[in-house]
Design a protein with these regions (language model features):
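Nucleotidyltransferase catalytic core that binds NTPs
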Residues: 23-181
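Conserved post-catalytic alpha-helical subdomain immediately downstream of the catalytic base
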Residues: 1-19, 23
Length: 181
């Protein structure tokens, strides 16, 4: 069994069950993000084993090199990376009409396909505050021009880390280039 092969109490997720039943080498064509409750259970299990849980969030609408570099750097800060992904309605409120370009299910699939991403959790609000209250990660990571004092939900993480933006990459720039602007 999956849980038996782990030290301590371990919640078996639906992705692990599919891997066990169908083989982990199968080509995935979909990913169902885990619920907040499943994510909390995993975070608690990882932390009980002394493993560091890193959390970041974003829209990740058109995944690009800047996103990948940022997520690799975030993942390197601990053993597990969880991404809070803005739901479609949240992205629309934050970014305006015509966004997101990619649906939340497609964005979640692309993020989960990255080997250094452990889980993706969708949130409907404009900020991840309630999700951070639920998960209480060891490290909360934000990108670019934030100051630690301005990070929403910092009180629910052990520490906050600010990583630099990768210059020259943004979803808005990609969209404008495609549109010939």
């Amino acid at each position: 069994g999956i849980a038996v092969s782990r030290v301590g109490t371990y919640p078996v997720g639906h992705t692990e069950m599919i891997d066990a039943w169908c083989g982990s080498n199968m080509m995935r064509t979909a990913y169902i993000p885990i619920s907040w409750e499943e994510a909390k259970s995993k975070v608690d299990a990882w932390k009980s084993q002394g493993e560091t849980v890193v959390f970041t969030n974003g829209c990740f609408d058109i995944l690009h090199k800047g996103h990948i570099t940022y997520l690799q750097q975030a993942a390197a800060l601990g053993e597990h990376l969880i991404i809070g992904l803005n739901a479609d309605e949240s992205v629309k409120k934050l970014k305006g009409e015509g966004r997101p370009v990619n649906s939340e299910s497609d964005r979640a699939f692309m993020l989960k396909s990255l080997r250094f991403v452990d889980e993706v959790v969708i949130f409907n609000e404009e900020t991840p505050l309630e999700l951070l209250k639920c998960l209480e990660p060891d490290i909360l990571v934000k990108g670019g021009d934030y100051s630690v004092e301005d990070v929403i939900g910092k009180e629910y993480a052990g520490e906050v880390r600010i990583l630099p933006f990768v210059k020259g990459y943004s979803t808005t720039q990609i969209i404008n280039k495609i549109l010939g602007k």
